[in-house]
């Protein structure tokens, strides 16, 4: 569909001049033809796989580049944003001057000028009251395909008078030669101006920068209105019971929320307002490393025509080697949410959550597969956001390393973590929600806890059997662990049983507990933070 009201003249308002042609909100069929155009070269060109989906490579950037993220510091953001150069917290919100912003904007608009452009107008947020109308501008067909998959696709009538609240200009082919003089990290940049309401991308082809860029914007706007903004997946049961799954990349958000017994609300980004939980997105972005049809049939079956694979190895016959992580461990597929059969329709939203699940992938092998949290422990573990950072989701990470990421998504937080915790706690108190800590990582055997066991644990949480189970407390961490659960090997519920001796667990537990305590020190400068210390590990 082409909307005649959008012309090259309109783009001059953004500083983009002499545009050859505008491909506006292209259909999937057109994008398919464009991506497979044999005259394309380099990272623009897609490859057809035997599953019907197109596969692309994103170059040296196979994950986000958090060190290249900047936000203009001005009157809008000076006193509200959680800046990287203020306080003890660690984040990626590096300040950018107005002067450098203008320079970067000039580079991107110059790159996009004189080109044939793809423009996708879409929504971020399933609630009409708080959604963002976003306009994506790119010269690369598959990047247009990515945002068409990942954001909410407007109906034709919604495009007639579409007025963007935010503009994303993707100039992946341009870099910044003056980065050193400007005090920046590299020639690549992902920059935001919350006053002009524009995101600029230069140097990186990775599609996830557009997805997570808008998540950072929602993370700024919504909590200031008292709405929880969450890095989580969500689903709903037959009785309308809603569960949310917090977790960093690779901990199981997409896998565990994609459940044939429950309808999917969304797999990564949600809000929680007075009406309930709602998706920000219109698609899913699943990791595909070691994907198998047997273990994850819903995700495997979603990989078909209109899905877009990233950085997978495609054999000469078009078949995909999902086990090959030679390009990156962070191989991905994006697909429109309706590629999953069991979803909430017609709008990706449901009622208030009653189960809140924190997913962690513990590389130390210390934490139990599941524990039930008290109210204070809920806040403590939400602010701690512990996991092992898994290989490949960020540039330069190849081995699992322990990490603490506030609210299970520090990279995307625009405000101080305590603001997200306050809003979440209010929502949980109002709905009577219970929180759980689920370890999808490793145990003392050195093996990862199986998807089968984790799914049985999630079932026990959702059907209430965990709440009715007898529990005992794990020393040092004071976590309440069930003595037995249906379908779960009883021996693994106590992590100490997976070690050759209790002393081995004690040694590793002490090391991990020290990391928790050190990390939480940054929150002890307020009475509320100090009061939560007792909910953490005790040495």
UniProtKB/Swiss-Prot annotation:
Q: What is its EC number?
A: 4.1.1.49
**Keyword Isomerase annotated:** no
Main location group:
cytoplasm
Q: Where does Mn(2+) bind?
A: 212, 231, 268
Instruction: Name its co-factor(s).
Output: Mn(2+)
* GO cellular component entries: cytosol
Entry annotated with the keyword Endoplasmic reticulum: no
Which enzyme class? lyase
InterPro entries, from UniProt? PEP_carboxykinase_ATP, PEP_carboxykinase_C, PEP_carboxykinase_N, PEPCK_ATP_CS
- List ligand-binding residues for ATP: 212, 231, 247-255, 296, 332, 448-449, 454
Q: In which pathway does it act?
A: Carbohydrate biosynthesis; gluconeogenesis
Name its cellular compartments.
Cytoplasm
**Cofactor: how and how many bound:** Binds 1 Mn(2+) ion per subunit.
Q: Where does substrate bind?
A: 64, 206, 212, 332
**Pfam families on file:** PEPCK_ATP
What is a GO molecular function of this protein? ATP binding
Subunit info here reads: Monomer.
**HAMAP family membership:** PEPCK_ATP
- Would you identify the family this protein belongs to, as annotated? Belongs to the phosphoenolpyruvate carboxykinase (ATP) family.
Protein's name according to its UniProt entry: Phosphoenolpyruvate carboxykinase (ATP)
Q: In which organism is this protein found?
A: Citrobacter koseri (strain ATCC BAA-895 / CDC 4225-83 / SGSC4696)
């Amino acid at each position: 569909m082409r909307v005649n009201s959008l012309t090259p003249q309109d783009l001059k308002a953004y500083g983009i001049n002499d545009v050859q042609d505008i491909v506006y909100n292209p259909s999937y069929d057109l994008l398919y033809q464009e991506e497979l155009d044999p005259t394309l070269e380099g990272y623009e060109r897609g490859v057809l796989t035997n599953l019907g989906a197109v596969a692309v490579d994103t170059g040296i950037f196979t994950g986000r580049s958090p060190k290249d993220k900047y936000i203009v510091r001005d009157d809008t953001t000076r006193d509200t944003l959680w800046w990287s150069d203020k306080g003890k917290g660690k984040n990626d919100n590096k300040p950018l001057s107005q002067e450098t912003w203008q320079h970067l904007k000039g580079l991107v608009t110059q790159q996009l000028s004189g080109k044939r452009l793809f423009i996708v107008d879409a929504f971020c947020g399933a609630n009409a009251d708080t959604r963002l109308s976003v306009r994506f501008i790119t010269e690369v067909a598959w990047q247009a395909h990515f945002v068409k998959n990942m954001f909410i696709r407007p109906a034709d009538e919604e495009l007639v008078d579409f007025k963007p609240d935010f503009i994303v200009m993707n100039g992946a082919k341009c870099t910044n030669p003056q980065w050193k003089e400007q005090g920046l990290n590299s020639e690549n940049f992902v920059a935001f101006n919350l006053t002009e309401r524009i995101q600029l991308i230069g140097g990186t082809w990775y599609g996830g920068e557009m997805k997570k860029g808008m998540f950072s914007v929602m993370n700024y706007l919504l909590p200031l209105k008292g709405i929880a903004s969450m890095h989580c997946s969500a689903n709903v049961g037959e009785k309308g019971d809603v569960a949310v799954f917090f977790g960093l990349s690779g901990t199981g958000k997409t896998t565990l929320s994609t459940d044939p017994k429950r309808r999917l609300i969304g797999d990564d980004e949600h809000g929680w307002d007075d009406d309930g939980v709602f998706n920000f997105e219109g698609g899913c972005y699943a990791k595909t490393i070691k994907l198998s049809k047997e273990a994850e049939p819903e995700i495997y079956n979603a990989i078909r025509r209109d899905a877009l694979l990233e950085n997978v190895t495609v054999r000469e016959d078009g078949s995909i080697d999902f086990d090959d992580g030679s390009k990156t461990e962070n191989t991905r597929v994006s697909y429109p949410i309706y590629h999953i059969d069991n979803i909430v329709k017609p709008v990706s939203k449901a009622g208030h959550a009653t189960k809140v699940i924190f997913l962690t992938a513990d590389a130390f092998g210390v934490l139990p597969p599941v524990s039930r949290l008290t109210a204070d422990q809920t806040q403590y573990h939400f602010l701690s956001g512990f996991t092992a950072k898994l290989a490949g989701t960020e540039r330069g990470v190849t081995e699992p390393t322990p990490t603490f990421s506030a609210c299970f998504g520090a990279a995307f937080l625009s405000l101080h973590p305590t603001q997200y915790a306050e809003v979440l706690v209010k929502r949980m108190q109002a709905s009577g929600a219970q929180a759980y800590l689920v370890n999808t990582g490793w145990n003392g055997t050195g093996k990862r806890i199986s998807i089968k066991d984790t799914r049985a644990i999630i079932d026990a949480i959702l059907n209430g059997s965990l709440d009715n189970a007898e529990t005992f407390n794990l020393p040092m961490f004071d976590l309440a662990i069930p003595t037995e659960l249906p379908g779960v090997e009883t021996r693994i519920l106590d992590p100490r049983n997976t070690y050759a001796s209790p002393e081995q667990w004690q040694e590793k537990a002490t090391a991990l507990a020290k990391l928790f305590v050190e990390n939480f020190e940054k929150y002890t400068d307020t009475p509320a933070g100090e009061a939560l210390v007792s909910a953490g590990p005790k040495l």
